[in-house]
């Protein structure tokens, strides 16, 4: 039996802060224990994704968009936005917040001296950037070309998140 629990942004803020804290501690410890470098690299890649998602969410909250939060602690998407209720301008603000966050994250890691931790994190962040281009950019371009806000609701969100 699966128990569905209503959670707000505070739960995910705490969850993600723990992920980032473990990541930073692993990064710090990777100087003396190589295995921690792998954990740190994967954690930094996950942090890139979380940074991207939180940028979307904070922009959605700022735009007063209607959002539904995930119900499972392991949800990969923090929320699903009801895009039919927002303006085109709000849609662009929310979309570009995630794009900009990913760009900042990539620039940050490109500015660091090369290391194994940085290499793993950068690879994962680049994968995120490619996925963003494949899945999110076409939606934003479609909104630019047409005069409508495209559906951005995540299909089956309630079932998987």
Predicted feature locations:
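Hydrophobic transmembrane alpha-helices and their immediate loop junctions
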Residues: 1-161
